[in-house]
Amino acid sequence: MTRMKVNQMSLLEHIAELRKRLLIVALAFVVFFIAGFFLAKPIIVYLQETDEAKQLTLNAFNLTDPLYVFMQFAFIIGIVLTSPVILYQLWAFVSPGLYEKERKVTLSYIPVSILLFLAGLSFSYYILFPFVVDFMKRISQDLNVNQVIGINEYFHFLLQLTIPFGLLFQMPVILMFLTRLGIVTPMFLAKIRKYAYFTLLVIAALITPPELLSHMMVTVPLLILYEISILISKAAYRKAQKSSAADRDVSSGQ
């Protein structure tokens, strides 16, 4: 579908197209949520066998705690497995308004986005989470306090620390995509740097314990990620400018 055809589409046609994409996403989520019922148990068992979990005795303080944890994992598995479908359907919805070259470029963002999400999860789970758990244990020992950890609390804290990091690692892809669409520019990102830094500091404070070292372990990677995002945005902006100039030359030549 060309840009001209997209411009000729009525509002009702756009709504019908959006409805179709949302329905596909909803059906995919239902399928993957059901799959989550089969995947949740082995994942929970695996996480209980890690060194961090083995050092703790996990308890159920309410009768429904194990069920809540199981359902929570099934839901998150459903969301994670549905995310590539969401990204593709989003691309399919906006791609008719893009040139062929732009469609290929934006489609390539999907695997990169998945890899960045996995990188964020890996960093938070293998580096940050063990450090935080060990830090909490040392505080308890120093205060001569016996920790009684609920299974619900343990996995809630684990997910609170890891999932947001996976999402925050999407920053370079999102900003590059917005740059290619002309919504933001690298100059704008540089201009709002101090506000972005403050926002990232607040986010880091929300997902980490009130302790300086763990807070810095989260904040520093996020700030570096923002600077990398600006560099990527600059490259995308220059490429978009060259593409626009080439299109103008072709138009003037005709």
From Swiss-Prot:
Keyword Transcription: no
Localization annotation: Cell membrane
Transmembrane portions of the chain: 24-44, 67-87, 112-132, 157-177, 187-207, 212-232
Its membrane topology: Multi-pass membrane protein
A GO CC term assigned to this protein in UniProt: TAT protein transport complex
UniProt GO MF annotations: proton motive force dependent protein transmembrane transporter activity
Lineage top rank: taxon: Bacteria
InterPro entries noted in UniProt: Sec-indep_translocase_CS, TatC
Predominant localisation class: membrane
Coiled-coil regions listed: none
UniProt KW keywords: Cell membrane, Membrane, Protein transport, Translocation, Transmembrane, Transmembrane helix, Transport
Any Gene Ontology biological process: protein transport by the Tat complex
Residues in the signal sequence: none
Record text on subunit structure and interactions: Forms a complex with TatAy. Two types of complexes exist: one composed of TatAy and TatCy, and another composed only of TatAy.
Similarity-based family: Belongs to the TatC family.
Other observations noted: B.subtilis possesses two minimal, substrate-specific, Tat translocases: TatAd-TatCd and TatAy-TatCy, each one composed of a TatA and a TatC protein. TatA is bifunctional and performs the function of both the TatA and TatB proteins of Gram-negative organisms.
Function: Part of the twin-arginine translocation (Tat) system that transports large folded proteins containing a characteristic twin-arginine motif in their signal peptide across membranes. Required for YwbN secretion.
The protein's name in its UniProt record: Sec-independent protein translocase protein TatCy
